[in-house]
Amino acid sequence: DAANVVKQIKAAGQWDNTILFVFTDHGGKMARAKQFCYDEGLHVPLIIAGGALPKELRGTTRKDLINLLDITATSMAFAGIDIPEWMDSKDLFAKGYGRKYIFSNRDRCDFTIERIRSVMGERFHYIRNFLTDRVLYQHNYRSKGEPFKTLKKMHEEGKLTPAQAAGWEKRAPEELYDLQADPNEIKNLATDPKYKKVLDEYRAALEGWLKDTDDKAADGESKEGLRATMTRWGKNCINPEFKGLTPLPMPKKEKIINKKPKKNKKVKK
């Protein structure tokens, strides 16, 4: 854990030469967290500490929007390395730093084919679902474990609230949430006329990002890529994109011989 890492650094006499970035995974066991673009899957803690951290930064907190992508440029700046202009990463402590929006994406994970994009601002969060022909909680590597196993059973028994059951219901192509009034992202405002101006703003922001990044997912996955996925995941590949395809041949396994070298025999004189 972080405490042991700090202990080891100090024991090595390197604490005053160290800046430590501590952040976490994003809720693998939570239903709408890992691999999804809701706040549960995007919002993680970040702590920056260390003996080499400038004194004026120690003990301070930030509440503005930042991207973990910015850890790269920030660490380069701390090390005195020039940040290339082409790099999307930004120095968190540079003068004038700020992000109006945070963009995120979800594509195929393992054998589960998906395409979701989102843009989050200080108050609103916009999500676009491209593959509305499948439910959010489609077959994935967590389907047979908890909490999905229990949640699915409760859904089949009609024991979930509408919000809890939404992951197995037909998805809206667009979602818009007021993070101040609805931090759990339950009430979708995308079809509410009162929020049309906000919706248009976030739509435009997302479209601009997709264009700037030349989003390749719009073309779908290659047949060879899908076939390779089938080779790796077999019967789990049930999305319609796999229909009519066959797995690529399994690569030949190389036999690795790990024998201990024989000791040289003593030569009798």
Regions found by a protein language model. Give the residues of each.
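Alpha-helical packing segments of well-folded alpha/beta enzyme cores
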Residues: 1-5, 71, 198, 202-206
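Long, internal low-complexity/basic segments
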Residues: 43, 157-174, 179-269
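C-terminal cap/loop subdomain of S1 sulfatases and analogous C-terminal strand-loop tails that border
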Residues: 28, 72, 79-175
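Beta-strand elements within well-structured catalytic alpha/beta cores of enzymes
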Residues: 2-5, 9, 19-24, 45-48, ...
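A generic secondary-structure signal for well-formed alpha-helical elements
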Residues: 6-9, 13, 51, 78-83, ...
